[in-house]
Amino acid sequence: MKALSPVRGCYEAVCCLSERSLAIARGRGKSPSTEEPLSLLDDMNHCYSRLRELVPGVPRGTQLSQVEILQRVIDYILDLQVVLAEPAPGPPDGPHLPIQTAELTPELVISKDKRSFCH
């Protein structure tokens, strides 16, 4: 499964919608017309199609209602929360012993006179 960040794309759309809603409520910008609700509807439809693309497990050829898309998004978020809540796997079992120079083969041990060449 490929990890994607759906937050940025939909966040921008939500911010855009929020700014438009505030402008309409304050009476700034365009006068309310039939064009404004259609563009909001297009933005929402774009967000739903984007969610549908980003959430794994949504079949490509099937029609889903907006409620079904949101339910799958919620299920996916809950699944991610469960995975993140699980403890991280620890180091593999077994003793971690430091290697002693006596255990190394003579070729791997650097003598004191050869160490001076390193620095």
UniProtKB/Swiss-Prot annotation:
- List GO BP terms, alphabetically: cellular response to leptomycin B; central nervous system development; circadian rhythm; epithelial cell differentiation; heart development; metanephros development; muscle organ development; negative regulation of DNA-templated transcription
Q: PANTHER family per the record?
A: DNA-BINDING PROTEIN INHIBITOR, DNA-BINDING PROTEIN INHIBITOR ID-3
Q: How is it modified after translation?
A: Polyubiquitinated; which is favored by Ifi204 and leads to proteasomal degradation.
Which CDD domains does the record match to this protein? bHLH_dnHLH_ID3
In the induction comment, the record states:
By a variety of mitogenic agents in serum starved cells. Expressed in a circadian manner in the suprachiasmatic nucleus (SCN) of the brain and heart with peak levels between CT16 and CT20 in SCN and between CT8 and CT12 in the heart.
Which one Pfam family would you cite for this protein? Answer: HLH
Indicate the principal place this protein occupies in or around the cell: nucleus
- Where does this polypeptide localize? Nucleus; Cytoplasm
The job of this chain, per UniProt, is described as:
Transcriptional regulator (lacking a basic DNA binding domain) which negatively regulates the basic helix-loop-helix (bHLH) transcription factors by forming heterodimers and inhibiting their DNA binding and transcriptional activity. Implicated in regulating a variety of cellular processes, including cellular growth, senescence, differentiation, apoptosis, angiogenesis, and neoplastic transformation. Involved in myogenesis by inhibiting skeletal muscle and cardiac myocyte differentiation and promoting muscle precursor cells proliferation.
Q: Name one GO molecular function term.
A: leptomycin B binding
Q: What is this protein called?
A: DNA-binding protein inhibitor ID-3
Q: How does it assemble?
A: Homodimer, and heterodimer with other HLH proteins. Interacts with CLOCK and BMAL1. Interacts with COPS5 and COPS7A. Interacts with IFI204. Interacts with GATA4 and NKX2-5. Interacts with ANKRD2; both proteins cooperate in myoblast differentiation.
Q: Which InterPro entries match?
A: bHLH_dom, DNA-bd_prot-inh, HLH_DNA-bd_sf
- Entry keyword set: Biological rhythms, Cytoplasm, Developmental protein, Myogenesis, Nucleus, Repressor, Transcription, Transcription regulation, Ubl conjugation
* Tissues expressed in: Expressed by myoblasts (at protein level).
Annotated bHLH domain residues? 28-80
